[in-house]
């Protein structure tokens, strides 16, 4: 199978296809997608999501039995089946691509290495996870994952935000817990469209995460999938062939989008009038990229170095963001339950050099306060909480704070653009001036010769004059030209 050859390996009834799929200009992934539905391809598995291949991409089975993806002589991905005596492969109707040995035993399968989607008959174990795309158009590994997390006596399915720094992650949603036994716990999606946790070799202890109440016929099946998406939510999709031929969301883990950790990077998420999430930066910081608010915010000035003996740091104050909660996770310095007042939570942060913010709230009629050493996982509107941010006294006011030109990368870029424009304008005007002088010199010589030949007086207005005009070429470039006129 090669990119140039455009070969596709179909399942028996044509439900799924295995082959190369284009993800951007001149970039392809080896993947599996639904082959019998109209519209854009819905990929359910990818081998090389983080390293797409070009037109030279080719899938080969080596003499050692290893299935590998090669591009321009370099191995991009391999199934690691060396020595397993691979004899054949099959694209199954379930969406699973499998490799068999001579005894028809499965030695490798795509179901055992999922990307962002779980299909019926596929099982998610504790050692596997689903990982989101990086954006709606970028298939590379994103910052969200769906996996089972362990408690002292149980397992539960959880959504996790993996901070871009890679230093820590935060679980912001979890399903019901299932107690551990001697058997492996699996998460699966059945053909009726229900999601459950169970023990792999037993029907006992079945625990539904979502149960579809619509009854299907005995042999009736629907196209369905569980997909974790770039916005941090995991959704159960069902293909509706009767009403517009489209994917319909039957269930979603997160019902309030702003409660998704990292939806605004380390910024604050608020819903607009249309209930769509909008990203804001806490006072004392600015957006890293206004066109990609999910990248989060950067501080306008560096945080104090508490290890230094230098006490020349600028004085700080606490700014209050009411009705705002901020995720803590590994950023929490300490928890306090003996805070006598809301303002006391801010005062604790102000007196702690390592604290950059603190959060106050009421839980079970008891006050809570936690201090933070960094802002990593983002915040959102919540009536029960108050967010305190430490800022320097000269930092400005509340709102979407923009850094001064000296510290904001975007401002530096604007200054560079202005400087470049001035250079281009100066060069163009200088060139035009030189051309005009050359034209005048040429014409003056011509007139002098005419005068010398005619021995007569001449009228000033009989001089040839020079004009410069601007012409735009067919390809949009601007070109200066000169011409003589009288």
What is the meaning of each model-derived region?
Residues 482-486:
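Protein kinase glycine-rich loop
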